[in-house]
């Protein structure tokens, strides 16, 4: 790899690390190309990305970012999964590790908070931002729906009573 290409790779990685919400590091030794493609596809569907780069270049790119703590995990054949959603990358990584024994999650970082394997698993068990937003909207809409039902209920009852009297008079 030429010096200019290395510099470009470091700049791209640095940009990724500066804008990410979470970074997960895992060993991928022994994965087939098809398995790596599956991992990349699953990460992309979840809104995350996977990077495989030279550890030395990744450590240089980590300098000056919030996720600098993951530099100590970069030993051997490592892959770095990143996402702006703090739950997306950990969730996919942990699920992928369950089905592929050659993929081993080492740890990660959420902002300046360092995560060990258990921290990554705990983060993966949380609901995603979209799920939380859906629940919040549901909680906000529910009272308005109940108020609307309560305000229309007396009028509906009155209409049914009038209808009952009208049908009673017609029958008589």
Curated annotation (Swiss-Prot):
Provide the family line.
Belongs to the universal ribosomal protein uL10 family.
Protein name as catalogued? Large ribosomal subunit protein uL10
Q: Please give the function described in this protein's UniProt entry.
A: Forms part of the ribosomal stalk, playing a central role in the interaction of the ribosome with GTP-bound translation factors.
Which species does this protein come from? Nitrobacter winogradskyi (strain ATCC 25391 / DSM 10237 / CIP 104748 / NCIMB 11846 / Nb-255)
Q: Looking at the record's lineage, which domain of life comes first?
A: Bacteria
Q: Which Pfam families match?
A: Ribosomal_L10
Under the subunit heading, UniProt states: Part of the ribosomal stalk of the 50S ribosomal subunit. The N-terminus interacts with L11 and the large rRNA to form the base of the stalk. The C-terminus forms an elongated spine to which L12 dimers bind in a sequential fashion forming a multimeric L10(L12)X complex.
InterPro entries linked: Ribosomal_uL10 (IPR001790), Ribosomal_uL10-like_sf (IPR043141), Ribosomal_uL10_bac (IPR022973), Ribosomal_uL10_bac_type (IPR047865), Ribosomal_uL10_CS_bac (IPR002363)
Q: Could you tell me which cysteines form disulfide bridges?
A: none
Name the NCBIfam families on file. Answer: PRK00099.1-1
**Gene3D superfamilies attached to this UniProt entry:** 3.30.70.1730, 6.10.250.290
Task: State the PROSITE patterns in the record.
Answer: RIBOSOMAL_L10 (PS01109)
Q: Which GO terms describe its cellular component?
A: large ribosomal subunit
Report a single Gene Ontology molecular function: structural constituent of ribosome
GO BP annotations listed: translation
Q: Any idea which UniProt keywords this protein has?
A: Ribonucleoprotein, Ribosomal protein, RNA-binding, rRNA-binding
């Amino acid at each position: 790899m030429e010096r200019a290409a290395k510099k470009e790779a470091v700049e791209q990685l640095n940009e990724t690390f500066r804008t990410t919400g979470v970074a997960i590091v895992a060993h991928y030794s022994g994965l087939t190309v098809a398995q790596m493609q599956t991992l990349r596809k699953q990460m992309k569907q979840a809104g995350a990305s996977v990077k495989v780069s030279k550890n030395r270049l990744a450590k240089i790119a980590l300098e000056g970012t919030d996720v600098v703590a993951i530099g100590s995990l970069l030993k051997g054949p490592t892959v770095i999964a990143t996402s702006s959603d703090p739950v997306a990358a950990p969730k996919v990584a942990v699920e992928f590790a369950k089905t592929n024994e050659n993929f081993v999650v080492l740890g990660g970082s959420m902002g300046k908070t360092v995560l060990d394997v258990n921290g990554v698993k705990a983060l993966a068990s949380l609901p995603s931002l979209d799920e939380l937003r859906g629940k919040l909207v549901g909680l906000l809409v529910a009272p308005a729906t109940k108020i609307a039902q309560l305000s229309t209920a007396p009028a509906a009852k009155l209409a049914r009573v009038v209808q009952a009297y009208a049908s009673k008079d017609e029958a008589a």
